[in-house]
From Swiss-Prot:
It comes from Streptococcus pyogenes serotype M1. SUPFAM superfamilies: Ribosomal protein S10. It comes from the Bacteria. NCBIfam families: PRK00596.1, rpsJ_bact. PROSITE patterns: RIBOSOMAL_S10 (PS00361). Belongs to the universal ribosomal protein uS10 family. This is Small ribosomal subunit protein uS10. Part of the 30S ribosomal subunit. The lineage of its organism: Bacteria, Bacillati, Bacillota, Bacilli, Lactobacillales. Involved in the binding of tRNA to the ribosomes.
Length: 102
């Protein structure tokens, strides 16, 4: 290929599904003859939401919810055409967001 590196960035709310997706990508790339760097764990985004439990008063009674977004980075160095075809056909778990940069 003309490009020497494919960068894959994965995001998910559950780290187990994210790790299985990263494991599938790494296994597919190494099986087809490409060099893989990663998966590199990136910082986890933590969103915290605070709401009042009561509808009208009792402001001291609050409840907090948090949402964590886990991220991984996988670099595929010197990919072949066979590697790209295998990655396009790869079936990843639902709930994993994939961003690919060539």
């Amino acid at each position: 290929m003309a490009n020497k590196k494919i960068r894959i960035r994965l995001k998910a709310y559950e780290h187990r599904t994210l790790d299985t997706a990263a494991e599938k990508i790494v296994e597919t790339a190494t099986r087809t003859g490409a060099t893989v760097a990663g998966p590199v764990p990136l910082p986890t985004e933590r969103s915290l939401y605070t709401i009042i439990r009561a509808t009208h008063k009792y402001k001291d009674s609050r409840e907090q919810f948090e949402m964590r977004t886990h991220k991984r980075l996988v670099d595929i160095i010197n990919p072949t055409q066979k590697t790209v075809d295998a990655l396009m056909k790869l079936d990843l778990p639902s709930g994993v967001n994939v961003e690919i940069k060539l």
